[in-house]
Amino acid sequence: MRKVSDDLWVYNTRDLMRASSCDHCTRLAIARELRIPGVAELVEKFEVPVAGLPIDYGMKFEADLEAELLESLGAEAFRKPEGSGYLAETIALMNDGVPVIYQGSLEHQIGRVKFSGRPDFLVRADYDLAFVDGKLTAIQDIERSSVGYIAWDAKLAGSPKPHYLLQVALYVDALAVLGLKAEGARHGLILGSRTLTTFEEGEIVPAMRQARSYILDAIENLEVEQFAFDSLSLHCDSADSCKVCEYPGLCAHNRLELDHLVQVAGINKSQIE
């Protein structure tokens, strides 16, 4: 999450994932952006670069899908925004009716809070993604309307996870605001098992809006004194939430400190917290 100005905060899909499961993540991010004394100095010790084998494998998976679609559809039917104005170019490509858009850009602002993200694939309403002979392609259904786009995200995982659906729902909602959402379509995930899974809008958007409301409420009703360092929890509510936490090392460190206090002082965690 980024504070651009007093009147604009920007969040992405991972911020929404965190907000859906852990108050600690959202509050710590807001405190960091508010420059609460002590917060930046603490979290910078636990910043983790976005790298490693899972990221490398994920990028290769996406690159393979990109190459397969380009080979299948050709350069005119499979496009990627190339300039600096990704959002404007993405909208232009959709208005031009390009069948498949790779790594486009979508935004949606409510009050002082703006979502900014990049769906892996935006597919025109009259096309279906499909694996043919093990390779990804898009097949046109000429009986369907070509108006609007369907959001797809690629995930290396072999099965859908709840926070993946929040991402897709954000893209669906942003398309709707632009008036470029395919009506009645099922949006979905391209999984590492080379299978597709789809969802109706009503299955995924309500949960996204609930998670988003936590971010909106926190920013729209923001009072700086509520984010004083001493009021912040320094670990996720559960170890499972650390899978999407910005500072998992801080969580582990803080839990270790609390366990040490319990052992030394003979008190329970509820007394510490």
Sequence positions of predicted segments:
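Beta-sheet entry/capping signal
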Residues: P99, D120, G148-I150, G184-G188
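Short amphipathic alpha-helical segments and their helix-coil junctions
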Residues: M1, S5-D6, G148-K155, L222-Q226
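Helix-hairpin-helix
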Residues: L258-E273
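Active-site-adjacent structural elements in folded domains
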Residues: T137-A138, L256-H260
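Metal-dependent nuclease catalytic regions and adjoining charged, substrate-binding loops involved
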Residues: K155, S159-L165, L170-R255
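Conserved catalytic cores of phosphodiester-cleaving nucleases, focusing on short active-site segments
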Residues: F115-Q140, S145-G158, Y171-D173, N268
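Conserved structured core elements
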Residues: M59, F115, P162-L165, A169, ...
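Metal-dependent nuclease catalytic cores that hydrolyze phosphodiester bonds in DNA/RNA
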Residues: M1-I139
